[in-house]
Amino acid sequence: MEKYYPDSGVEIRGFTAKFYDNIMNIMSFGGYRLFIKKAINSMYINQNDKILDFGAGTGRNALLMNKHLSEKGEILGLEISELMIAQFKKKIEKFQNINIINQRIDQPFELEKKYDKVFISFVFHGFPFEIQKNIIQNAYNALRENGEFIILDFNEFITDKTPLYFRIPFKIIECKYAFEYVERNWKKILSEFGFIGFEEKLFLGKHIRLLKSKKGKQ
């Protein structure tokens, strides 16, 4: 199956999809595990939250989020990679409150309920701008009033002004959409879709950001 977006790096398949968690651990010298745990702690999850996980991957993030939930809390993952869905299902076998479905996040969809939080982690930057707008609208539609859209991804910066230790791997690894993503004012863009009350937490030399916003009125 061909990629929807040939210039994107977020449609992961084959070997990378099968061993994604291990690859991330090795590439980060074990640091990714600690980083993602800190980031999810910064979401300030309430124990009864219902969370929608856009681009849910292998379920690693879902398990970390679930540690903050009671039995009344829920997580639904949306993912399109069958290899990743299989890993997700294996990880959540003993958890009745976590589920996953095969669903694209870049196209309109409807769910049976509204959610307290929509979380997207290192997926958003890998889409064309017009498709990112679709994802924002999907998040808005899926949230209850005052629900939170939480984006964990690159912060805003000018690539050529970043330190070499960050700039070189960023230019080597990232797709063209990432270079456009980091130079956009996402608070302004999100506000145009009805999101308000922005909060952020920065990581890794301020190059990574957890951006939280609340659903207001469109």
Predicted regions and their residues:
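Class I SAM-dependent methyltransferase SAM/SAH-binding core
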Residues: 52-54, 58-107
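A short glycine-rich, Lys/Arg-flanked "PGG" loop and its adjoining helix->strand segment in the class I
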Residues: 133-145
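Core SAM-dependent methyltransferase catalytic element
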Residues: 194-195, 201-218
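C-terminal alpha-helical "lid/dimerization" subdomain adjacent to the S-adenosyl-L-methionine
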Residues: 4-7, 151-193, 198-202
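Helix-to-beta-strand junctions that scaffold the AdoMet/dcAdoMet cofactor pocket
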Residues: 70, 128, 143-145
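Conserved class I S-adenosyl-L-methionine
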Residues: 1-43, 60, 167
